[in-house]
Amino acid sequence: VDILEEKTKDQDLEIELYKYMGPLKEQSKSTSAASTSDELSGSEGPSTESTSTGNQGEDKTTDNTYKEMEELEEAEGTSNLKKGLEFYKSSLKLDQLDKEKPKKKKSKRKKKRDSSSDRILLEESKTFTSENEL
């Protein structure tokens, strides 16, 4: 009796998984809602027959489910990666634009500062040489 209860629990969990996976499968394979309902009824059919064919059907569906989940994880990972790359590229462009604007202003200021610092250096060198001459 415990074995039958465990099998029904497994079947219920598998059905819930297919309900959850249904919309994701539709997006990736562009299938209609009718095909997912056919798949759900197909997965329920073999499991309600004898135990030997039910186990084989369950093994196949769990293998397929595992493969589908891996594919979805890979697909989601690549979409996140693409989003990350787009964000990185856009932030680089924004950083470059921000850096270009202040550079122009800073370069003008540096020239002014350089000329004033040159004057100061010249004056210091004159005072230093005049002090040394004394």
Swiss-Prot record:
Q: Where is the composition biased (Low complexity)?
A: 39-54
Disordered: region residues: 21-82, 96-134
Where composition is biased (Basic and acidic residues), the residues are 57-69, 114-126
Report the transmembrane regions from the record. Answer: none
Tree of life domain: Eukaryota
Instruction: Quote the biased-composition stretches of kind Polar residues, using this chain's numbering.
Output: 29-38
Keywords from the named record: Malaria
This protein is called Rhoptry antigen protein
